[in-house]
Every structure is written in structure tokens, then in C-alpha cells.
């Protein structure tokens, strides 16, 4: 049976007339998987999507991570509805924002103080400003391939070597801004040390995805994050954890709790909103007191702390406090990993699979993936074919070889079993096309 996307194709054609590129985020485009009209979804419930053509999918996109409790979770939708009935925006303090801030602090002890914003991009952008205000320095460091939103300072690629300054990774980012950014490879202590030896006295902070989620799921090598803290603090700079993807995804207390390493500042987003727009940042009291109205680092937002997002976030965290929830995600993730690897061996398809608990990435390569260079050197064309074969099987993935598969609390063993069978059929088709 061939799945038809007639209405999605027509809708995309219309969208191209009104929306830039036909999408509101480039990651939704099918450009990276061979082109064509992206599938337009009409509704989601639990672990499933239905598109505008009526096709049903098991969803592993999970909105790029936030939908850990599945689509339209009743506890969360009830909280959002109640908040909406009471007014979606006040422009004043509320009891909800205080309650939610306390919940975040209890979950992540590194957060002495918290401030809400509207997105992960805003959260990261502001932690950089706060770090600069606190240290009096201007440069930042980041790891190659790690995505920290779309503000100018983080859209910077590596220069010609670890001891050179960055180059713009997007049109519209001035070279003068790129000169404030040093990019080094993830999981490589020596290049980090080399860069800090040269530039450390000018560095305000380093941005760290403690578990990488933006060139697939890549864990830090044992001792790497501890060494990052040591070297960066020796240079007088701060450590910022970008936990926009990782917080509440792998463990209730985030990657910093799972790995036992504490940053100075933390940026949050995605999961904490329960599906609504949100961001937050926090950290040590003496650093956060740089933020207005207490300090000179200005940050504000009309929509920040809005009642709907606060209510949704509180409800989401209440669901995530259920006993055994993360163990279930890990169990299902292990089952899916085992099945995919068995199907790859059966059909002689070369893959490397990285998994941590309820998230995984399938790379079409035989190489170990520990940094961005290795992730780049994988077969994107093969992934594009696999992606479209899986759509035909009723399995929805992110349209990029760099993205993760995210499990939700609503996936079942039957969903995993079907997915493994679908992977087998897709791998068989790929093997036949070689």
C-alpha cells in the first residue's frame, strides 16, 4: 500500500505563497531528506499523529523533544484550559510563576534563582549576557555542532583551528560578532585546553550541551564535563549548561543530576513548557543578581511567565514525577535499540546507534559518533531514503540525519514492536536498492 500525501502537497503549495519557504522553522522542511512537501499534521493524541490526509503515524519527533508526555495529555490540557478561562496574559506577577519556579529549583539544585522567558533561544541568549555582566568579559566558547538557538552569537562556526576565532554560520551575522566566539570540538580536552590557554583571559563563559542532542544523541566521555568545569573555572570563566533538550528528558533533575556535574548557569526550554512556548534560565544567586531589576543586565518580556505556559509547565512536571516513568522510557528505548540493530544486521545495513534512555539516533555509518565531525561524515542520502520509507510505514521521524528519535510516556511495547518491523521493511528496501 502506498500512502498518499495529496492534501499535504496542496497545503504546502499554498503555504509557499504566504509563508517563507512554506514552513515556520527550516527544520520542518524536507530539504535535508531529498525534498518534497513536508507532511502537515492535523491532530495528535498520545504517541500518535494524524495528518491532513488522514494517515496515522507513531510519532518519534515529539516536536523535537518537548512532548515527553505524549500529545494532548489530559492533565496538561486541563491545566491549559483552566488557565485560558482565567485569562491568558496579565502583564503582572502571578502565583503560578512562583509555584513553577519553586518546582524547577527543587528539581535542579544548581538553580538558586530563576527567570522565565519565552524560548530556549532567549534563555541561552540571556545567560550569555548575564555571564558577560558578571565577569566583565566578552568572548564565549561553544562546541562544534551544538545548537543553542538562533541568536547572533551562537550562529558561529569554527574557524580554521581550535585556536582561531569563529566565522559566521548564517547570513546577517557580522564578522565582528563571530570574532567574539571560540568553537572547539566536543569530547576533546586537549583542544579545549589549547583554546583556553590562548583566549581564556577574555572568555566570559562556555556553552555546553551536557548531553548533545543536536547532532544526534552523543554522550560526554567519562570525565570530560568535570574537566570542562575545571579548565573553564581556572580561566575565571563561567560554565553554562544548555539543558533545553536534556532537562527532564533523561532524568527529572536534568543532565546535571544524571551526570553529577554542576554548572554556574542553566538554560531551559522545551519539556518544561508541556508543549507551550517557554524558556527559563537560572543559576547561582550571586550571578543571577546581575539581572534587572537587581542588577545592570537587562532582560524583559511581555509574554514571560504567562499563566498558560506556567500552568502547562507545572502540570507537565507533575506528570513527570510519577514513579517509574523514566525507567519505562529507558526500557522502551532499549527494546527499540535492540530491534533496530537486529534488523540492520539481518539486512546488512551499516548503522551506528547512539542511545540514552528514551532518546536515540540512527546514523548510517560504521564509525563511532563522539563529535560533530563524525556525525557529519554519515550517509545523509541513505537517511533521506530511510526517512521516506518510514513515513510510508506510518512512523514519523525528524527530517534530518542529525536529529534524535524521542520516546514519550505514551508509547507502548506494541508501538515499539511495530516500529521494529517497519524498520526491517525499510532496511530490506534499502538493501534491495543498493
Swiss-Prot record:
Q: Where in the cell is it found?
A: Cytoplasm
Any one GO molecular-function label of the UniProt entry: glutamate-1-semialdehyde 2,1-aminomutase activity
According to UniProt, the reaction catalysed is:
(S)-4-amino-5-oxopentanoate = 5-aminolevulinate
User: What's any GO biological process attached to this entry?
Assistant: protoporphyrinogen IX biosynthetic process
Which cofactors must be present for this protein to function?
A: pyridoxal 5'-phosphate
Q: In which pathway does it act?
A: Porphyrin-containing compound metabolism; protoporphyrin-IX biosynthesis; 5-aminolevulinate from L-glutamyl-tRNA(Glu): step 2/2
- Coiled-coil portions: none
First-level EC class: isomerase
- Answer yes or no on keyword Isomerase: yes
Task: State the GO CC annotations.
Answer: cytoplasm
Keywords linked to the UniProt accession:
Cytoplasm, Isomerase, Porphyrin biosynthesis, Pyridoxal phosphate
Subunit notes for this chain? Homodimer.
Return the NCBIfam families for the record: hemL, PRK00062.1, PRK12389.1
- Full protein name: Glutamate-1-semialdehyde 2,1-aminomutase 2
